Amino acid sequence: VSANDIKNVQDTWGKLYDQWDAVHASKFYNKLFKDSEDISEAFVKAGTGSGIAMKRQALVFGAILQEFVANLNDPTALTLKIKGLCATHKTRGITNMELFAFALADLVAYMGTTISFTAAQKASWTAVNDVILHQMSSYFATVA
């Protein structure tokens, strides 16, 4: 991932994350659940598909993504954060990479409708998401 991609992702995420807890967490998760029945069902099955439990998961998602974004300049730390996320999801039996890819793409779509978002910034998010998803896929392949 280039330095420019890192800057673009950090700048755009910062705009969204500033209001994540108060505004965007619930709005994004509502969009995500509406856009993907499979994701919605996975959360319902885990008991976190609505109400306070869903809000808590949305806040956790934001906090995890914040850690990923903050560590884009440190590949070792980023890898450890990604492995931690994967380990947690593995214990829950959630390893379907299509769901993770959809969630990250849906986040980019959400950002495109809520903050000023250029084509270059969108491309940077795609590059960063590809790195995250590749590492996740590699992790799940080694622990399957």
Swiss-Prot record:
Residues holding heme b: 89
GO MF annotations in UniProt: heme binding; metal ion binding; oxygen binding; oxygen carrier activity
Domain Globin residue range list: 1-141
Superkingdom of origin organism: Eukaryota
InterPro entries noted in UniProt: Globin, Globin-like_sf, Globin/Proto, Mb-like_M
Subunit architecture: Homodimer.
Assigned protein family: Belongs to the globin family.
Name of the featured protein: Globin-1
Source organism of the structure: Phreagena soyoae (Deep-sea cold-seep clam)
